[in-house]
């Protein structure tokens, strides 16, 4: 709860006038408890899980962009995708939503705030960079562990039921995997705590990234292609394509860990063979044309 009865009192306490965004935030949250504000995290995640993958459903259903589909032989029906969404929503209600509620004391403990002032753009960007780097590194090692015999058979194999991933399948996993992977997601905000709005932006962007990575489509116009060391859909799709025996492409977001620790060798060999195959097919077409 914001400890100021009016906007004027808040302005006096801050020593300046509130920005437009701060005024809107004050009007909305001033009478709400910190716990009530934090519970909005559940709504944020529900909207992201439900709405962000939906355009990919249209893309898959219509076939308008099949030229960009990575595994072209695999096609999902509307029924398949709706079934995946239902399973994800069960996980959301039973695991994700519950986890958000019971984790509130840890939010208080690390110092994630919901009052004024709101963070500056530079503060938000700096914290998001830290969060992505911390999550990526810790997620890499947890993901590698999940591909050991016990971790895969007992937990991670459920996520790999989709050998050709789709957007709604990004959070499709064993309940234990959801809980375990919550650790790297929360670790960044725990180390560099910020505002609850930054926290919401962080978990939203992380889910957007996961949905794109599991989209099954490699769109050439994606702005994420401009991000250095970004893995993306084609990179992660190989991991799902290989399946349970995969010891390659564990990266959550960036590819540097796979490169440093040598877990992208299979992928690089695959890319070379694919490139060689494409060249041979192009040469065969050229020869046939001249004949």
From Swiss-Prot:
Cofactor(s) needed, names only, are: Fe cation
Q: Does the keyword Membrane apply?
A: yes
Where is the chain membrane-spanning? 41-61, 92-112, 114-134, 178-198
Loss of function: phenotype: The double mutant smo1-1 smo1-3 shows no obvious phenotype.
Give yes or no: UniProt keyword Nucleotide-binding. no
Q: Which GO terms describe its biological process?
A: sterol biosynthetic process
Q: What InterPro entries would the database entry show?
A: Fatty_acid_hydroxylase, Sterol_Desaturase_Related
Q: Where in the cell is it found?
A: Endoplasmic reticulum membrane
Q: Where is this motif: Histidine box-1?
A: 143-147
Extent of motif Histidine box-2: 156-160
Query: Tissue range of expression?
Result: Expressed at low levels in leaves, roots, siliques and flowers.
* Any single GO CC term annotated in Swiss-Prot or TrEMBL for this entry: endoplasmic reticulum
Enzyme Commission identifier(s): 1.14.18.11, 1.14.18.9
MF (Gene Ontology)? C-4 methylsterol oxidase activity; iron ion binding
Tell me how this protein sits in the membrane. Answer: Multi-pass membrane protein
Domain Fatty acid hydroxylase span(s) in chain numbering: 128-263
Where is the motif Histidine box-3 annotated in this sequence?
235-241
Provide the alphabetized UniProt keywords: Endoplasmic reticulum, Iron, Lipid biosynthesis, Lipid metabolism, Membrane, Monooxygenase, Oxidoreductase, Steroid biosynthesis, Steroid metabolism, Sterol biosynthesis, Sterol metabolism, Transmembrane, Transmembrane helix
Give the catalytic activity: 4,4-dimethyl-5alpha-cholest-7-en-3beta-ol + 6 Fe(II)-[cytochrome b5] + 3 O2 + 5 H(+) = 4alpha-carboxy-4beta-methyl-5alpha-cholest-7-ene-3beta-ol + 6 Fe(III)-[cytochrome b5] + 4 H2O; 24-methylidenelophenol + 6 Fe(II)-[cytochrome b5] + 3 O2 + 5 H(+) = 4alpha-carboxy-ergosta-7,24(24(1))-dien-3beta-ol + 6 Fe(III)-[cytochrome b5] + 4 H2O
Q: Which family does it belong to?
A: Belongs to the sterol desaturase family.
Q: What more is known? A: Requires a membrane-bound cytochrome b5 as an obligatory electron carrier from NAD(P)H to SMO.
Its subunit composition reads:
Interacts with ACBP1.
Any domain commentary?
The histidine box domains may contain the active site and/or be involved in metal ion binding.
Q: What is this protein called?
A: Methylsterol monooxygenase 1-3
Taxonomic path: Eukaryota, Viridiplantae, Streptophyta, Embryophyta, Tracheophyta
Query: Gene encoding this polypeptide?
Result: SMO1-3
